[in-house]
Structure formats: structure tokens, C-alpha cells
UniProtKB/Swiss-Prot annotation:
Family note: Belongs to the ABC transporter superfamily. ABCB family. Mitochondrial peptide exporter (TC 3.A.1.212) subfamily.
Annotated InterPro entries: AAA+_ATPase, ABC1_TM_dom, ABC1_TM_sf, ABC_transporter-like_ATP-bd, ABC_transporter-like_CS, P-loop_NTPase, Type_1_exporter
UniProt keywords, alphabetically: ATP-binding, Cell membrane, Glycoprotein, Membrane, Nucleotide-binding, Transmembrane, Transmembrane helix, Transport
Molecular-function GO term, any one: ABC-type oligopeptide transporter activity
Biased composition, class Polar residues, residue ranges: 754-769
Protein's name in the database: ABC multidrug transporter mdr2
Originating organism: Aspergillus fumigatus (strain ATCC MYA-4609 / CBS 101355 / FGSC A1100 / Af293)
Domain ABC transmembrane type-1: 182-471
Lineage of source species: Eukaryota, Fungi, Dikarya, Ascomycota, Pezizomycotina
Transmembrane regions listed in the UniProt entry: 182-202, 220-240, 307-324, 326-346, 422-442, 445-465
Pfam families linked: ABC_membrane, ABC_tran
Amino acid sequence: MRGIRSLPCWAPGLSTKRIPPRELFADLFPNACVISARHSARNGLIRQFSGCSGSISNSCNPRPYRSAITSLLSANVCSKGVSAVQPRFLSTVRLFSTSQRSLEPKSNVKSTGGQVVRPELHQDQEHEDIEKGFELSERAAQAAQVNLSAKLAKDGAAGKKAGFKEIWRLLLIARPEAKKLALAFLFLLVSSGITMSIPFSIGKIMDTSTKATTEGGNELFGLSLPMFYGALAGILTLGAAANYGRIIILRIVGERIVARLRSKLFRQTFVQDAEFFDANRVGDLISRLSSDTIIVGKSITQNLSDGLRAAVSGAAGFGLMAYVSLKLSSILALLLPPIGLGAFFYGRAIRNLSRQIQRNLGTLTKIAEERLGNVKTSQSFAGEVLEVRRYNNQVRKIFELGKKESLISATFFSSTGFAGNMTILALLYVGGGMVQSGAITIGELTSFLMYTAYAGSSMFGLSSFYSELMKGVGAASRLFELQDRQPTISPTKGEKVASARGPIRFENVTFSYPTRPAVPIFRDLNFEIPQGTNVAIVGPSGGGKSTIASILLRFYSPTEGRVLIGGKDITHMNAKSLRRKIGIVSQEPVLFSGTIAENIAYGKPQAKRSEIVAAARKANCQFISDFPDGLDTQVGPRGAQLSGGQKQRIAIARALIKDPDILILDEATSALDAESETLVNSALTALLRGNNTTISIAHRLSTIKRSDTIIVLGPDGRVAEQGSYEELSARPDGAFTKLMEWQMSGGEVMDQLANTPANPVAQETSWDLQSDDGTEISEDTNIPSEPRTID
């Protein structure tokens, strides 16, 4: 809040030295004159100008100035009315307002013929203030310093520079399936060899048929024609069987690789720390686990097989073409360099487009996952059209990228196809002349043309193989980045925890969230919780109450200082075994799809049925008996089939079944009705008499009173107060007393200040004024909210 020394910039003639109260306010309100006024009008003005009075009283010696403004407001207004005073005074109110701005327009009044009405005088200024919204505070500047080192790159760690290293690593994924892939490759050689023998056989058949017509021959390769055709049919059948074996082996291997990839990546994702999930969107992770793994699996199985088949067929085709005619082969060789160059640039373009498509598919998955997961909220605000439009906009982006990919593919394949057709035409022209000259036979020309078609098809196959391989490299680079990412807090390293009993001590703990390192949550936080006690942690919203639970669970590590349990630093403990000793019930409980029994047993997977029933009874889950299937009732996704209170009681049972050494209750009864809360609290009270240490993050007075010790967190990230309820309540000026008064008042005082005309949201909590003689001017509770006539 700006102080009284800023006055000279808007009040000419005033200096920063102390000014007598009457002179100061006489300068501020030159049109105020001393005539009698009604008490109600005076109180109306007191409400109107209370924001400034409180601000000035906080910046100066309060009593003289409060007396001065009381004297001025006790007087009547001269014939010019309030409107002559108010504009200048409004600037004073704005001067002393805090950085927080009210979202509601400021209410200004003027007098017209004795009737107070709302003027249009300051509408432009009010509109400008509303458009500005909230002024940024110093904390906002700190929050702007974002650390996203844990965020995965959109194109993977290698980005657009992915090359041979990524290709080799991609192929190594298939190493466990090497034997099956070798068998598939053997089948590939058999089927490709048989396929490539067909053109040669057809050429010989044509030459034999021509010779039989002219010379009467009826044998082929030393076999009669019927025997030759029978043998050829058997060979083709063998080729089909080999092709069948190749396809089915590769499909099975591909599915196995995809399943292994998904399992490994999901496990790697699940062990990441909280910083990782703070920085990455769930939709992008789902996209990597689903579509990216499919692309990679296809790339190293089916696509690899197609590429090898194209390579074998192409090599055999070019070799047999050279055997038939070197002259015709040299003509065909002229086509290879431009096709190879075009295939190279085509593959690069497809790789970049594939990355963009996968990135946008991740965004699309994120939109669908978030919106469908919160569909009731969208429907409650009638936001269906907005969300469908948002989804369609992303679909349109993917469509445009797909259209661009189609255009590039069509251009490449059509141009290479046209070049191939022109080459065939040239071969027919040259080959026809060679047949006429007797250099080659008609059968040899036919075989050569068929080998040309096979070789051309192989070239197309290699181009497709390269483009699909680049897609796989793009997807694999995204998977490798996730696979290589090591969590900052490993859940499996450290000393295993046999027991988490003992005092809990925070020693000089300083902490900021990793994604917002410049915004400190705690500064030299120190407190100790004795073993077996019930401690309530209270404080303002955003003060770090739930952060204490996150640090104890080792979701985050302190920036400075240390946290001890039983005298041992938790950073040296195995996080997974420590979490097994801690039970937590959050304010917004999360249930998983499955039965009630499965959700309760989630805290202890090997729990017996009797243990599940006992935990449910402790948590007052009698509502289970109202379901036809009892404990086997399906709760639906995220517990959608249950009410909020029912979900919370199941969450309490899930924590109790662990019999944890440390129980953290983060507003655990916030969703319960009064009767259920009483029953659950009774159960918790009986439970807490044991050796369990309980930390209650509380706002409700009933929870706070039940605690042995109360720790009050201050806005500066330190402990403001600590003690029992009786001790802290006995301190009238203590932080706990003020916090409780604020909560129990329901915010009425601040609401009154926020609704006061011409008073932006200010920090004052009391605005009683005093007259010159020291008597208080009390608030007139009968003043209506609408402006009244000033007599």
C-alpha cells in the first residue's frame, strides 16, 4: 500500500512533512462547509470514505487524522453538494488501494436536486480500471521465473537432428526377438527368390512356345511342359507358405514389442517424481504410450520386413536385368539417381510432418482426456459448444498436416511413377529394335520388362520403407526421452524404513516448488511433532499446509534444511517403503475404477476380507449395506457412482487399513455431513489414542479442538504460533485467534469493505471513526444499500 508521502503528486501545495489534520483534509475537501446534517447522511459518507480513512490511519498518526475526517464528515455539505467533493476524493481512495483490484465497478454518487443518484461522471475511468483487471504483484514477478527442466521436448531429446544413432537404437529394441526375426528373414528370402524367378520362367516359356511353333520343340529346362508347369505350381505354393510364415511371425513379434514398450514406458512414467508431472501434460504422456509405441512397433517389424523384401527384390531384379541385357540396364540406370535424391528429400519431409502430427495428436488426446474427465463441469456452464469447437480446432490442425503429407506423397509417387512409365516406353523402343536385330529374344525382352516392373516396385517399397522408418525415428525419439528420464527422487533408492515412528522434526526447511523456484513457500521453517500426538496445521490459504504432507511423502525435497523422522533424515530413506508407513486422506479423494473392496484394499493389497470390513466400519461406511452388491459394488470411473461424502469415507477406510505410523488428514471430513463427521471423528479419536502420529491439515474448528497441538503457519513461510487450543485461544492478538475470528465471521467485515461504494478491496478490517472529543461514531446498521436522500 502506498503511503502518505505520495500525496504531493496529486494534492498541490502539500509536502511530505506532517500536516495538521484539519489543514490536510480542508485541502482535500475545499467545498465542505459547516452546516447541520442528518445522522444518516453522515453515516452514509462515513461508509463512502471509510477506505481512505483506514488507509491514512495506517500511514500516519491515526487519531488526529481520524478526528479531522470525523469533524469534516460530521458537518453538512454546502450548496454545491457532494458531487463537488467526490471526484477529487476518489483519487485519494485509489491512491491508498492495494495491488488487488475489485472486479466490481466502483460505485460513485452525486446529488441532483437533493436526491443521490449514480452519475456517469467516472464511467470511463471505471471501465478502464475494470479492463486492467488485477495489477501484478511482486509475487507474480517471482512466479514468472518458471523452471521447466523436467518438461519433455515436443520432438524428443534428439529433436529434428535424429539420425543414425536413433535408427540403430530403434533396431536394438527388437534384439529380444532376434531369433524369430531371423526365421522371418529366412522365409523372406525363400518367398522373394521364388517371386523373382517368375519373370525368368515366363521369358523361357515364351521362347519355348515360339520355338515350338517354328521348330516343334516341347521341352523346358529338360522337362516336358506338363511336368514343368506342375513343378512351377509347387514352387509357387512353397513361396506362398513362406510368405504366410513371414507375415504371421512379424505380426506376433510386432505386437510383443509394442506390449513390452508400453509396459516399460508406463513403469518408467509411474516412478517419476512430482516435478515431472507438474511440468508435463497427461495427454502428451498418453499419446507417447499409445500412438508412438504403435508407430515404433510397426517401424521395426512390418516396415523392416517390407524394406528387406524390397531390397532383396531390387537387388535380384537389377542383377537379372544385367544378366539379360547390359545395354537396356544402362538405360534404366539413368533413372536411379533422380529417384534416389527425390526419395531422400521425401523421407525428410515426411519425418518432420510425422513429428508435427504426433505432437498435435498428443494435444488432441490431452484435450479429450481433460474435457471428458470434467464433462459435468462443462455441461453445468453450458460449455459444450466451446469444448467441441476447441476439439475441432485441433482436429483441423491435424487434418491440415495430413493433407500436406498427402500432397507431398502424391507429388513424389506420381512423379516417380511417370518417370518409370517413360522409362518403360524407352525400353520398349530400344528393346524392340534389339529383338528385330536378333540381339535378344522376345522372351528375354519380356523377362527384362517384368524385372523392370519388379525393380520399380522395389524402389517404391524402399521409399515407403524410408519414410516409415523416419516416422518411427520421430516417434522413437519421443519414447527414448521418456525412457531415459531419471526421477530426481528415486522411489527405490535409500535405506528401507522398518518403522516411521518417532518425532517428526522440520529443521530450517526452505522450500520452493521446482517449477517456481523464485516463489518461496517456506523460509527457515522449524517445528517438531512428538511421536503419537495429534497435531493440527492451520494457516492462510496457500500458506503451505498441504506442502508439508508432500514433503513428508517425499514427493519433493527441501531446497534447504532437512526433515527428520525418528532422528533420521528422510532424504536418506527409501521413498517407497516410507510411503507404506504413511496413510493420507486428501481433501478431494480419488477412487479408481473397480469395487469398493478393491479401493479400500488399495492401501493394503493383501488384506483379508475381515480387515476390509473392519476398516470400512471404522470409517463409518454403513452406506455400503444399502448397495445390492455390498463391498463388490462398482464405484465407476473416479468414483462417479458415489457421493462426495461416500468417496471420502472410503478414502478414510483405505488409509486406516494400512494401520500407518503417520496418518495425514488433509481436510478429511470436509465432504461429510454433520452426523457422519461426528461418527468419523469419534472413530478417528479412538484410533489416535494409539501410537500413530496424526497430522491434520484443518480449517474446521471441531478438528482443530481435537488436536493436542496446533501449528499456525504464517504468510512468511514460518511458524507464527504453536501450542494447544487453550493456549492459543487465550492470546487475543495472536495469529491463531485472528485466523479463527476471520473464519467464524464468514468474512463479513471484508465483504462489507469490498461492497463499500468508491472503495476498492482494501486491507482495513475496521472502520469505526472517532470525533474530536474521542467519542466513537458507531456504524448505523439500518443504512440501506441503495443511496438515500440527503436533506
